[in-house]
Amino acid sequence: MEILIVGVAVVALMVFVSTKIKKSAAAAYQPETIETEEFKIYKPEGFIHPLNDDSGLAFVANSKEWGKNEASKFRQAKAVVRVISNSDFKIVCENAKKSSGKVKSKQFVKSAPVGQKIFLLEGETTEADVKIITFWEIIESGKKIYELKIAVLETYAEDFAERINAMTASFNVK
């Protein structure tokens, strides 16, 4: 009888813990605004921002879902922010153009806030036979350069269009 009581208690505890874990995991994919001392960015629904990321990047957000078939090793979308403190704005923009493969659009924003330069770039690359669309927003502010790069598998570009627009529109350097 005691074994039955202990067994029921263990099962109840496992259900409780499992429910808590599922709720925490679901909450991690909810939209939120990430704000640091240097920039602010909106993380849309369906993306997770790993807290203990050791990539050296200022911000990382990965889509919940992975690609399918030949793209199964890629996230459907990924966003990263790099802070560069020892380079030239034009060099960073040129490097982004080279990395973006086929350039679909590029422009310097004329209405940038005072003291900032902004460059927008959209490109298309292929990695392991998988087409990837990249969106870049590069901002020079003070002595630093902030590089937002969003990569989305071409197959899912339309599904992520609104979320990508929200993320790029919200990217703000202080």
Residue map of PLM features:
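Conserved polar/disulfide-associated segments of primarily extracytoplasmic proteins
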Residues: P50-E147, V152, Y156
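Structural motif
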Residues: F39-Y42, E140, R163
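Surface-exposed amphipathic alpha-helical segments
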Residues: E45-F47, K144-K174
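N-terminal signal-anchor transmembrane alpha helix of single-pass membrane proteins
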Residues: M1-A27
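Residue-level detector of secondary-structure boundary/capping sites
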Residues: E38, V83-S87, E162
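Aromatic side chains
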Residues: F16-S18, F39, Y146, F160
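N-terminal "mature-domain start" segment
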Residues: A25-A58
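Short flexible/disordered coil segments
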Residues: Y42, A112-L120, T168-K174
